[in-house]
Regions:
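Extracytoplasmic/secretory-pathway proteins
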Residues: 14-303
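Bacterial Sec-dependent signal peptides at the C-terminal "C-region" and cleavage site
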Residues: 1-15
Length: 303
């Protein structure tokens, strides 16, 4: 059972990129023992030089490869990572290890122990998030777990809190924290992500889409003075009723309205591209018969 964890590393990355290139090459060729040997070198150097982002990345990659080689080794890998968490003297580093361990457990979606692992994952994330003030004061550039939408990171101030909470899918916590501390831009995005994470299943039915739209519109009323509200507008568009008779006209009107209000939000190009698609020339072709035989003429009606 494989574990794949993506990390975003700074351009001035330590250790030398050649080590990670050697790891990538070995992993791509499915030479796990060679890849683990390279990771061990990275772990030793990262530990000595306190390059924590690379250290965590290497530890998780090593654990993932070990589990791929021996699927029954998850508990041993997790125990080793938990020991690293306990040995860490920095509370920030302990939070990062707890996050990594929580992610490792969270990715175990199969097997009879799935529910137990999910609970362990929640426990790890709870440890990681027990001091949100500390995480909010720590810049994430030293610790580089992947963020689902890195273009949102600026609003979050580049802090470690949004990285850890994002991995834990605790967007509601983020929304409440940022609201309480006056960062409405981050609170808006956190509310949007929380809605996506917990209520995306509403989008599968017409009535559910209506509930989703109402929830989005409530958030828009709160955050409409912010450019970040454009992210909510994107979700509103995606939830529009596809079966409405005038859906194309309604969508175009909504896009124009949203762009006029929040056009500065970088991801509004999504709606601009949607508008281009909606207004592109279209035609329909109808065939009188379902089967077409070679060498036999058929009439094609183009509307």
């Amino acid at each position: 059972q494989g574990v794949a964890v993506q990390f975003c590393l700074p351009k001035t990355a330590w250790p030398p990129t050649s080590l990670w290139q050697r790891f990538d090459k070995a992993a791509a060729a499915w030479q796990p023992r060679t890849a683990i040997a390279v990771l061990d070198k990275i772990i030793v150097r990262a530990t000595a030089e306190k390059a924590y982002g690379h250290l965590v990345k290497a530890q998780i990659a090593r654990g993932g490869l070990t589990i791929q080689i021996s699927p029954d080794s998850l508990d041993a890998v997790a125990a080793q990572m938990a020991a690293e968490e306990q040995r860490a003297k920095s509370p920030v580093l302990r939070a990062v290890y707890a996050t990594a361990l929580g992610k490792l457990y969270a990715m175990q979606q199969r097997g009879i122990n799935r529910k137990a692992y999910q609970q362990k994952s929640r426990d790890c994330f709870a440890r990681a998030l027990k001091d949100p003030d500390l995480l909010a004061k720590t810049q994430a550039k030293t610790y580089e777990p992947a963020v689902e939408r890195r273009d949102m990171s600026k609003a979050f101030g580049g802090d470690l809190l949004h990285v850890v909470a994002g991995e834990a899918k605790e967007y509601g916590l983020l929304n409440r924290y940022y609201e309480a501390h006056g960062n409405r831009r981050a609170a808006c995005l956190a509310a949007c992500l929380d809605l996506r994470e917990n209520h995306s299943d509403w989008l599968y039915t017409r009535s559910g889409k209506q509930h989703y739209q109402h929830a989005i519109d409530s958030l828009i009323n709160v955050y409409q003075d912010l450019d970040e509200c454009g992210e909510l507008a994107i979700d509103h568009y995606e939830a529009m009723d596809e079966d409405a008779k005038d859906i194309v006209e309604r969508r175009i009107r909504y896009i124009d309205w949203a762009i006029a209000k929040w056009g500065a939000w970088p991801r509004m190009n999504i709606l601009r591209n949607k508008r281009t698609d909606l207004t592109a020339p279209q035609f329909n072709i109808s065939l009188q018969e379902r089967q077409m035989l070679p060498g036999k003429e058929r009439k094609i009606h183009i509307n």
